[in-house]
Curated annotation (Swiss-Prot):
Residue ranges annotated for the Protein kinase domain, each copy included: 30-837
The protein's name: Serine/threonine-protein kinase greatwall
Main localization of the protein described in the UniProt heading: cytoplasm
Domain AGC-kinase C-terminal, first and last residues per copy: 838-881
Gene, per the UniProt record: MASTL
Location within or outside the cell: Cytoplasm, Cytoskeleton, Microtubule organizing center, Centrosome; Nucleus
Keyword list, A-Z: ATP-binding, Cell cycle, Cell division, Cytoplasm, Cytoskeleton, Kinase, Mitosis, Nucleotide-binding, Nucleus, Phosphoprotein, Serine/threonine-protein kinase, Transferase
GO molecular function: ATP binding; protein phosphatase 2A binding; protein serine kinase activity; protein serine/threonine kinase activity
Phosphothreonine modification, residue list: T743
Active site: D151
Region Disordered: start-end pairs: 1-20, 310-345, 706-732
Entry GO CC: centrosome; cleavage furrow; cytoplasm; nucleus
PTM: Phosphorylation at Thr-743 by CDK1 during M phase activates its kinase activity. Maximum phosphorylation occurs in prometaphase.
Record field: catalytic activity: L-seryl-[protein] + ATP = O-phospho-L-seryl-[protein] + ADP + H(+); L-threonyl-[protein] + ATP = O-phospho-L-threonyl-[protein] + ADP + H(+)
Amino acid sequence: MSTVEPLSDEGVAAGPRRIEVPRPPSIEEFTIVKPISRGAFGKVYLGRKAGRLYAVKVMKKADMINKNMVHQVQAERDALALSKSPFIVHLYYSLQSANNVYLVMEYLIGGDVKSLLHIYGYFDEEMAVKYISEAALALDYLHRHGIIHRDLKPDNMLISNQGHIKLTDFGLSRVTLNREINMIDILTTPSMAKPKHDYSRTPGQLLSLISSLGFYTPVGMKMPINPNSGGASDSLHEVISPLSMIEKENTPLSTKLFKTGLDTSPLTPVMPVRSLTPALLQSRERFGASTASSQSCMYLSSMESECCSSPRLEKDVKQTEDEMCSTGTSNSRPPLPSSREVLNSKDPKVLKKELESAISPISSNDCGSRQKLGTERSEITDTPVTTLDTKGIVRKCLSENKIWEEKLVARREMTNEMLETASSQQSPLFLKDPVQPVKEEEIFEKPGVKRSFELVDTSPCQELNYVKKTNAEYKRGCWISELSASKSTGLTTEIQSLMLSGEICESKEIMRCIDRQQTEKPLVPTVAKNLLCDLDADHEKDKEYMNSSLLCADDEKPLGALSADSDLSFPETSVSESHLEKQLVDLDKGVKDLSFEEPKAEDLLTMSPNCQEASRNGVEADVVQNCTMLCCEQDNHQKHTEETDTISSPSEKMTETVHLFRKNNVVFRSYNSPINVSNVSDPCSMASLDIMDLSPACSGSYPTAITPLQKTPRQGDAGTPYRTPKSVRRGAAPVEGERILGTPDYLAPELLLTKPHGSAVDWWALGVCLFEFLTGIPPFNDETPAQVFQNILKRDIPWPEGEEKLSDNAQNAIDILLTFDSTKRAGLKELKHHPLFHGVDWDNLQNQPMPFIPQPDDETDTSYFEARNNAQHLTVSGFSL
């Protein structure tokens, strides 16, 4: 037996009643009729919605961000939303899209007072007094509610249909409400006494006025004020999803990518801001916790590290890597070979083509259809990013594989000849400790940071990376040998014998030195294509190399303390290279800074021009003193080394000067930065801190590889920072150094003098407007803004004379408004008692007849704005937003 649902009076089955939730309208609901005017920060259009006309002010978010005016847009919206006065333009809606902010206000058909002034030439005294009186009431209302206009001028005074004045354009205003406005602020804003007009707002208007303006919303994301536009959501989803252009049927995967990759707050800065936290956490996870991992681990390049710093792009990289891993697993492919094997075994062109196809999301060699690609993409898992071998190889091969391959062969032959010549030198130290041959692959195994041609594959940062990635046992953690140069009294600083002690790593330094001196190095640091370019991930193959490493991860800590406070640091880098640089000072690795023509006894020790200039400027004395500290510390461990006087020997002095300059060449690295590492156990840390204000330009003949950013300037001896430290202290905030905002002719002197200012700046501007109404020209007008500012500071007012002379009351009213001392400047109270405003009915101004009442041809007539536009050569015929 069936049951019949009870019906309502209309004959419809009774059920739960749906209550429509109020929501703000969309900007699509407004129809643009014509443009009205254009200002410094936006354009004003005449719009229509439901048969009613509005003035729509359009401001581009990108322009507001570029001009650093984001907070001013918020202030303008708040000031208009809080105001309920017959002398202030009424704001109905505050809307926004992905690119623009829209302020929907009432349309005043009479135009602005500036246009009327251009037509009249100047106003008579009665007309000027009425306009100034209504503007004074508007200013008093704003000041009582904590709002300072700061841009009062005839251009921002609009004429209503009845001829009354209404202030507009609060783009430079200041709202003392130190929080976002809420519903209570708008509902309980007091209005004028017994107004005839109702200033109530609809729920949709209230919601739009208290909504947050998202200036950093991701591109294409749906704005919070328009939650019910389903069609727009679908279209935006298609634009953003990377898979929508490939396979639109794959809805679950597209939805997953959309939610995970772009699930951010509307106010989250995604594109213009770089987040450093993910990169630092990944750095700790990879290199900081353990060194026992023997897995192949590739480093990100500088461009890739930036991508991973962004939450959105990081997830894209993650899914791409997971896709590659899943594809390789499903096809049972063998693991990728190491980067050295790939680079040495294949032709560069073939290698480039294969690697491009391997890293590309859409492989050109894949004979499958789009459906197959979608199936593979559906296998994406949520495993973290493990390796970037293929991506790192592609980045390297695309940038320098051709040049590196061509020059590598020639450099190998040249180095072999130089090595034989250097090995033939018979010194006591060589006889005592013969040099062991070095494998070519240990020297040419990685191109390294591309500082210059000679330094392509000899980056000192490689040794630090090996330390972090190996658990090999170190044998040289106790004492280190020292370069002992022969004494010489010649002025040419000759090196009579080059004595080196050593192991494989020391002969490796000889070869590096020989390679580096074949070409004159530029003084300007070259740009590094990749700050993190260690392409070789085959750790097991280099066990012997790592066993002979000069660095001990347990005993020799990096100079972590310098990474935060050192003014020698370059942008986008870390102090990890200084870990290796310390060893270069203590050891005989300083020979890499010497210039060699031929490896003979009569070679000359030369310094780079930068270092020579530093010596002439008196830097050498401090360096020598610090050299003594280093040598004394090393002599305690070396009994077989003869004592040398560093002060009396020019050769030794310059050698150690080069050492210290080499050490202080601190280069930051963006991804492998040791974060919480102490430098207490460093034997040379104190001496290095004493000379940290040496210029990084004095780096010997070893040019520094830095990013294409500005180098940090030389820090003075006083230690004064070039930028004020960020304020994290408690207590009262310091006085903010504000910019000078406004139109030059109407600026108060305290604004020009960058003094703290208040509501008195508006009364000064009102005095300027009164003078302009009576004369047709602002009192401080001149040819250039600089001359206008001088006239304001001198209070140079050209009073009319003869028949054009102003009345005494008018001149006195202007004087009290243009008082230089802001504390003695007149306000509404003084104007009410002034003789010029004697017959003004202040309590009933909005009902008084006005001298000018606009007579438009129709409701869409904008001709009253044309006079000002023509005077300022503004063309508003276009509809471009």
